[in-house]
Design a protein with these regions (language model features):
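Conserved non-cysteine loop/helix-boundary elements of the Radical SAM core domain that shape
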Residues: 1-52, 60-77
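Terminal RNA-binding accessory module
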Residues: 68-161
Length: 161
């Protein structure tokens, strides 16, 4: 897709599906990627304001078409681009999550938090990670949760009575 075709498809999704959450995967430093190409990537991220993104530095995978291409982007440049990209992605991810502050959302509780054994965690219908004050009897249940804090990668909340 061209940038304009991509934007058109993105806008169609946003305008057709209320509340849709859109994430993406982005590789930086692909063979032949120029600074202009990278800036185009940043432009798209700024335009789309993704709910989240999985970002990676290009690395060769044997047998793929790109493994036969010259890996001409220096590692330091790949690292710089990844850092710059992540700053932008994280900003929009946090802003997306902050829209849920004080909102009540449904969460499918999956298990015990790895960071706090007094909390459980689960996911909203748009796959946002929520850490919840609550006991293990909530696991495998869908519960209504009021969002109390928002970060780039997760939300915190309490079960609504």
């Amino acid at each position: 897709y061209t940038k304009e075709e991509y934007k058109t498809l993105f806008d169609k999704m946003k305008n057709t599906i209320p509340g849709v959450a859109i994430t993406t995967d982005i590789i930086v430093g692909f063979p032949g990627e120029t600074e202009e190409d990278f800036q185009d990537t940043l432009d798209i991220v700024e335009y789309c304001k993704y709910d989240g993104a999985y970002t990676f530095i290009y690395s060769e995978r044997k047998g793929t078409a790109s493994s036969f291409m010259e890996d001409d982007v220096p590692l330091k440049e790949k690292e710089r681009r990844l850092h710059e990209l992540n700053e932008v992605v994280n900003k929009y991810s946090r802003e997306s999550n902050e829209k849920l502050l004080n909102q009540v959302v449904e969460v499918l509780v999956i298990g015990i938090s790895t960071k706090d054994e007094n909390k459980v965690y689960g996911y909203t219908e748009t796959m946002k990670l929520v850490n919840i004050e609550g006991s293990t009897d909530l696991i495998n249940k869908i519960v209504k949760v009021r969002i109390t804090d928002a970060k780039s990668f997760s939300l915190d909340g309490v079960v609504e009575s």
